[in-house]
């Protein structure tokens, strides 16, 4: 039938029924009643005396029962408790000035249980310890030395004295507890001075988030438990029973704090001066704002406790490219702050009896990303009592957030297709695997800038009916983002394709391992048919990516709205229909991105790879 495949299975091949590499051979743990386990005369079969719930067999097959069903221990939604407190106090002082105060507090407590963690990069890349978090079962492991054939021959004598994990997941479920608190204090004053209304106030806010993660595994402690030569050693062949995971199971934390201080003064006058069509209104103001953020990570994540891959591993790595926690990428502590000062003004100018205009300007200076000046001009013409035409043009900016400016080296794992392997070995080659992306903040970032324009009309054919249509366009420059792992790998493939067999460097932001020959036609990583026009290269170890100001972007659209309201003896009722239509989305390719687009065309070196 239509659903008779694995598409809807939503299960993981990484489970407690582990797989291991011994050289190029794959050994898998099976249930005792599996056909592989009942082959008592087979030289490919191994058991551990006293463990009757498993066997180890020389096979890469993954049975249905060996796939993890996430829902076994996973909470779709854990308990959540929220508390809010908001208090207001307004009063008028003896001098006529109004004072207003606000105090608010928010707290939430939540928790959730997940499933066991799996090391990063499990799969074919784990051969010889080439994955992100390679795990070695060393020759000293007690349980490895207990594996034996039905005739008593030991695994370490007949196969090898060490194994690499290929697919695996710990049996201890992960979980987390989270507490978040936010408080805010506002104190303001408003009054009149001559013909001006004024309003001034301060805002102080602080938010904290404390999260504890449980059921996590330390790579350092795990290696020590695997190296143990006593029955207290971690048993990698346990299939979820009597594994001895307690010795390396730990809890870790992440604590975040953000703070905001803001003070401002605004003054407005409905009639600064008069024109033939009416009075001109004006608003002026100033603001100073300080923002801080502090992201504190656990010592096993931030590099205080440093983990390095085993010396036998093909992937030789350490912090900041890997952390000491299974299934977690490294993240440094991050701190950032900025002080922003702003001046702004606005004019409401009547140009004719039925023609109004608005003019606004805002200048802002930040001590990290620089200065910006933006403005707005708008017109509203009402030729009849039931119709109005309106148009506006403005400039705006979006500041880079504190993380994109201040973040240190942050490594994340994502599954990506390696275009070079596809180009060199064909579309049938399994070119998708886990790749590290190394991102970093950039203190040279500029704010995104945009030009916004719109034109439309408002119709009020009756007292209770309003119809609006607006055509708009947003053109953005210096969009902030990452070039992306896939684009970096495509650029690497393009450079190598253009350079031929002598181009062995490619994109310097793509770090590749050594090429490992596999001449076994039965192997899923067979590569003896490598394209002779390309320099041989190994899998991508990591891709270096930095936040940048990227390409220009244009977005066009049309907004429609119809609103009808009616008053009755039973109350007031209203209905509103809104539609947002995107007419065009255009992102201009520039620099390396333009090269990729050009190379992906018919006959180009990247044809069929994008």
Spell out what each predicted region is.
Residues 1, 99-101, 198-200, 280-286, ...:
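Transmembrane beta-strands of outer-membrane beta-barrel proteins
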Residues 26-80, 86-88, 96-340, 368, ...:
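Surface-exposed, low-complexity loop segments enriched in small/polar and acidic residues
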Residues 80, 92-94, 193-194, 272-277, ...:
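Outer-membrane beta-barrel channels and translocator barrels
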Residues 89-91, 191-193, 269-273, 345, ...:
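Residue-level signature of outer-membrane beta-barrel architecture
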Residues 178, 558-584, 605-610:
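Conserved C-terminal beta-signal and adjacent last beta-strands/turns
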Residues 222, 343-345, 373-384, 455:
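Feature captures outer-membrane beta-barrel proteins of Gram-negative bacteria and organelles
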Residues 337, 364-373, 451, 562:
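Solvent-exposed loop/turn segments connecting transmembrane beta-strands
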Residues 355-367, 379, 389-393:
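Transmembrane beta-strand segments that form the barrel wall of outer-membrane beta-barrel proteins
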């Amino acid at each position: 039938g239509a659903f008779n495949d694995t598409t809807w299975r939503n299960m993981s091949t990484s489970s407690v029924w582990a797989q291991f590499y011994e050289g190029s051979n794959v050994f898998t743990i099976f249930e005792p009643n599996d056909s592989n386990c009942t082959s008592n005369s087979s030289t490919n079969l191994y058991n551990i005396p006293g463990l009757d719930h498993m066997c180890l067999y020389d096979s890469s097959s993954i049975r249905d029962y060996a796939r993890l069903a996430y829902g076994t221990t996973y909470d779709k939604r854990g308990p959540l408790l929220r508390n809010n407190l908001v208090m207001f106090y307004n009063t008028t002082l003896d001098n006529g000035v109004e004072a207003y105060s606000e105090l608010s507090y928010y707290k939430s407590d939540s928790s959730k249980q997940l499933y066991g963690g799996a090391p990063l990069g499990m799969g074919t890349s784990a051969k010889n310890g080439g994955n992100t978090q390679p795990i070695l079962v060393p020759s000293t492991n007690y349980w490895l030395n207990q594996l034996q054939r039905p005739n008593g021959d030991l695994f370490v004598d007949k196969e090898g004295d060490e194994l690499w994990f290929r697919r695996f997941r710990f049996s201890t479920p992960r979980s987390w507890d989270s507490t978040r608190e936010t408080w805010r204090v506002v104190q303001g004053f408003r009054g009149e001075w001559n013909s001006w209304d004024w309003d001034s106030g301060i805002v102080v806010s602080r938010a904290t988030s404390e999260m504890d993660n449980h059921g996590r595994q330390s790579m350092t402690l795990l290696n020590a438990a695997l190296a143990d030569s006593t029955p207290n050693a971690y048993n990698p062949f346990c299939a979820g029973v009597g594994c001895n995971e307690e010795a390396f199971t730990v809890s870790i934390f992440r604590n975040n704090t953000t703070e905001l201080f803001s003070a401002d003064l605004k003054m407005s006058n409905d009639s600064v001066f008069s024109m033939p069509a009416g009075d001109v209104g004006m608003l002026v103001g100033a603001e100073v704002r300080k923002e801080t953020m502090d992201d504190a990570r656990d010592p096993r994540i931030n590099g205080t406790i440093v983990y390095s891959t085993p010396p036998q591993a093909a992937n030789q790595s350490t912090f900041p490219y890997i952390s000491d926690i299974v299934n977690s990428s490294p993240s440094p502590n991050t701190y950032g702050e900025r002080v922003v000062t702003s001046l702004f003004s606005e004019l409401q100018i009547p140009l004719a009896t039925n023609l109004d205009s608005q003019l606004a300007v805002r200048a802002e200076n930040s001590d990290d990303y620089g200065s910006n000046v933006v403005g707005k001009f708008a017109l509203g013409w009402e030729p009849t009592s039931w119709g109005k035409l309106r148009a506006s043009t403005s400039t705006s900016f979006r500041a880079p957030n504190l993380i994109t400016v201040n973040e240190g080296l942050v490594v994340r794992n994502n599954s990506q297709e390696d275009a070079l392997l596809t180009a060199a070995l064909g579309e049938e080659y399994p070119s998708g695997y886990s790749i590290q992306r190394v991102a970093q903040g950039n203190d040279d970032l500029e704010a995104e800038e945009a030009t916004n324009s719109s034109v439309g009309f408002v119709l009020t054919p009756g007292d209770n009916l309003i119809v609006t249509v607006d055509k708009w366009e947003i053109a953005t420059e210096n969009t902030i983002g990452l070039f992306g792992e896939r684009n970096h790998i495509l650029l690497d493939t393009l450079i190598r394709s253009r350079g031929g067999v002598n181009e062995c460097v490619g994109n310097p932001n793509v770090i590749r391992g050594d090429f490992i020959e596999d001449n076994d036609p039965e192997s899923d990583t067979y590569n003896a048919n490598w394209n002779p026009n390309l320099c041989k290269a190994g899998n991508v170890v990591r891709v270096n990516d930095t936040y940048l100001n990227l390409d220009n972007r244009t977005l066009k659209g049309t907004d429609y709205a119809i609103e009808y309201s009616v008053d009755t003896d039973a109350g007031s009722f209203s209905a509103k229909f809104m539609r947002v239509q995107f007419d065009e989305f255009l992102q201009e390719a520039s620099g390396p991105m333009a090269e990729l687009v050009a190379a992906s065309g018919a006959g180009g070196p990247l044809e069929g790879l994008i």
